[in-house]
């Protein structure tokens, strides 16, 4: 049964407990770096997401990347504000077949369409917020997968900043200009707040209803989703960790 649950905990921690150390177990998710081995083409390409497209002449790039960056810019209309394509090949081992697989983009300027193996997965508008492309049921387990991203930096009145460059007093560079990661989890998982798009929710939401000089009380709401076709029995274990990795409070 596909559903979600929100688990709430109150953690009370005392400032004097900061010296306590404790090992932290695995979170049950894998995060893979997707910043390398991209191919880039500045300009539009007809059916640029096709798996059989010849991209041998494209430029090899690593992310973060800007579609055009010259030695200096002086004056409007000197930054590229057109279309660009990015492509990346990858294979996944069969051990991930029963997992949830998403690609997390921290930022693409300005609008983009994301494809896997020639099929559109999602689109995103605006370069200042991250987003997630869910690949779970689209992976080719027998060969190469092609992740393709069509990026548009053309002025769009509906997407900030919403004006052509000669109408603004700052530059906004185009492309996949922030990190990209693949996140692999079980089908029962703590959600991604950007994917869920819930006000003050999704993932883990922390508030501090009581804070004094000597102690503080933290409220944790954990958003868990079940993508299996069965009810699941589970527990959520939360820890509050300081900058040195010491666990100062925990709850289950």
Residue ranges and their predicted role:
Residues 1-28:
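Bacterial Sec-dependent N-terminal signal peptides
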Residues 18-27, 89, 133, 203-209:
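A short, compositionally biased domain-edge/stem linker segment
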Residues 20-77, 150, 154-159, 175-185:
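Accessory carbohydrate-binding/adhesion or oligomerization-edge regions at the termini
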Residues 28-29, 76-81, 207-215:
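Short, solvent-exposed beta-strand/turn "edge" segments of beta-rich domains on protein surfaces
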Residues 32, 44, 81-197, 227, ...:
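Accessory beta-strand-rich segments of carbohydrate-active enzymes
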Residues 43, 63, 123, 250-251:
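Residue-level detector of high-confidence beta-strand sites
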Residues 116, 213-252:
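Beta-strand-rich binding/interaction modules
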Residues 187-227:
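Surface beta-strand/loop "capping" patches
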């Amino acid at each position: 049964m596909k559903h979600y649950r929100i688990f709430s905990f109150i953690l009370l921690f005392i400032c004097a407990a900061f010296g306590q150390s404790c090992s932290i177990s695995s979170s049950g998710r894998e995060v893979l770096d997707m910043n390398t081995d991209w191919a880039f083409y500045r300009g539009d390409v007809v059916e640029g997401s096709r798996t059989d497209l010849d991209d041998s002449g494209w430029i090899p790039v690593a992310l973060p990347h800007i579609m055009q960056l010259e030695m200096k810019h002086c004056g409007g209309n000197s930054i590229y504000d057109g279309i660009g394509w990015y492509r990346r090949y990858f294979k996944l081992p069969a051990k991930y077949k029963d997992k949830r697989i998403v690609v997390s983009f921290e930022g693409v300027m300005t609008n983009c369409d994301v494809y896997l193996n020639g099929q559109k997965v999602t689109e995103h508008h605006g370069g200042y917020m991250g987003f997630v492309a869910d690949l779970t049921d689209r992976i080719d387990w027998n060969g190469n997968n092609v992740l393709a991203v069509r990026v548009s930096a053309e002025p769009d009145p509906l997407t900030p900043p919403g004006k052509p460059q000669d109408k603004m007093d700052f530059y906004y560079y185009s492309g996949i200009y922030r990190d990209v990661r693949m996140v692999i989890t079980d089908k029962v998982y703590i959600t991604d707040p950007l994917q869920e798009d819930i006000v003050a929710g999704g993932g883990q939401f922390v508030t501090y209803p009581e804070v004094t000089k000597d102690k503080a009380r933290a409220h944790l709401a954990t958003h868990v989703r079940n993508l299996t076709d069965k009810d699941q029995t589970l527990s959520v274990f939360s820890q509050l960790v300081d900058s040195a990795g010491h666990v100062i409070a925990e709850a289950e």
